[in-house]
Every structure is written in structure tokens, then in C-alpha cells.
Amino acid sequence: MFNLKNSAKRLLAISAFGMFSVVALADDASIRKNLKERFPNFPAIDEVSKTPIPGIFEVRVNGTEIIYTDADANHMIQGSILDTKARVNLTEERTTKLTAIAFSALPLKDAFTIVRGNGKRKIAVFEDPNCGYCKRFEANMQKVDNATFYMFLYPILGADSVAKSNNLWCAKDKAKAWQDYMLRDVAVTPASCDTAAVARNVEFGKKYKINGTPTLIFADGTRVPGAIDAGQVEKILASAK
């Protein structure tokens, strides 16, 4: 049976949604237009979305970078939004989601492997050869068995790090050269080859905000910055199955 009251409610709901969508699209268009006009060199905008604060919008650029603006882009805010009730850094939470790395998305062709035991468990590691914490981490990892380590050379500590990483990548036995240097302080032998993989690692890390070494990525996507010990690695490996 036709119900005028219910039909009217549905019509109002649809109309309200339509008006909201139009307003949202108008805000999106206004922000994009004004930022482009006022900042000709402004990066291409990936997405404009609402924030929990009325009238404030998130503008995402370069894949993972976030700024905030009002609906007309008259004011721009760089920094974090904090939810004081929940005690949560909303910007940090959002950035974590944007920079999450699925293991399947890792460019494994740009890594070399160190296999221990049956190699069934998987860990990706981004390390700089001049990183003291990385050397400590490598020593600890000798206690972790039955795992394959995908080693990404990630020289972010200066020109010498780049030179060493390039030489390590060009070594005949990358895994041996790496462990000789990191564990036994054996000098890296100069070598030459196509080192584009090392440069790609740096670009990949910048994109996903890998800001320090070592950084670990487990098979389930868990990302851990810092030189955690073998016990902590084993615990994460057990839960990442």
C-alpha cells in the first residue's frame, strides 16, 4: 500500500543526501581551483576529504602527504589534528593507513635474500650499511631461524652510505658481502654494476615514509621501525602467520 508519509521521508532523505553530495563536490572543486590558482607549483592533489572538524578539509598530495584547509582554501594548516577526548592523533592514524605496505606490494626484485633454516617465514628489512642500530639488529637476527630475510639496501645517511650500498649490491655474493661487513667489519670491496635498484629503494622508502633504519615489514603487513631483538621478532612472526 502506498504510504504518503513514508514516501515523503524517503524523498527528503534522498534530497538531503543529494544536497550534501553537491556541497561536498563544490568544496572539492573550490579547494582544487583556489590552490592551483594561488600556488601554481602546488603538487597535484590526490584527494580532498572531510575531517571531523566542521569546515576543515584534508588535502592529500604526493600519495601520503596531508595538509588541511577551509572550504575555499583561504587558510592552510600544516600539522596534526588531535582528538582530545579519545586521545588520538588523527593525522598520525591517517598517515599510518596511507603508508601501510602490503608484503605483496614490496619490490622484492630490488632486494637480496638471506635464508636461514627452511626459510618459510618472511621478513623484509630496510637498512643502511652505516647504521649502528642496523649492525646491532643483524647480530640479533643470527638467533632467528627458519626465515627468509629480504634485504633492501636503503642508504639515507649520506654519500658514503650510497657508495657502500652500490658496492654491496654489485657484489658477486650480496648476502655474504653484507654479513661480512655488518657482522665482521670486513671492508666492502669496490664493484660496479647497474645500481638502479638501490635508487629505487630510496624512492620507495620516501613514498611510504620509511624515515629510519632498520625498518621491518612482516608478511601480514606489520611494520616495525627500530632494532628490535630476536625475541620480539619471533613474537611478531608467530602472530603474522
Which residues does each predicted region cover?
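Conserved NTP-binding/hydrolysis module of P-loop NTPases
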Residues: 168-170
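Extracytoplasmic thiol/disulfide redox context detector
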Residues: 2-7, 20-166, 180-183, 187-213, ...
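Conserved, helical-rich catalytic subdomain that frames metal- and/or nucleotide-binding sites
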Residues: 172-175, 179
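Short, exposed beta-strand-loop hairpins at the edges of beta-sheets
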Residues: 225-226
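Short strand-turn-strand beta-turns centered on an Asx-Gly dipeptide
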Residues: 62, 219-220
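Bacterial N-terminal signal peptides
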Residues: 12-21
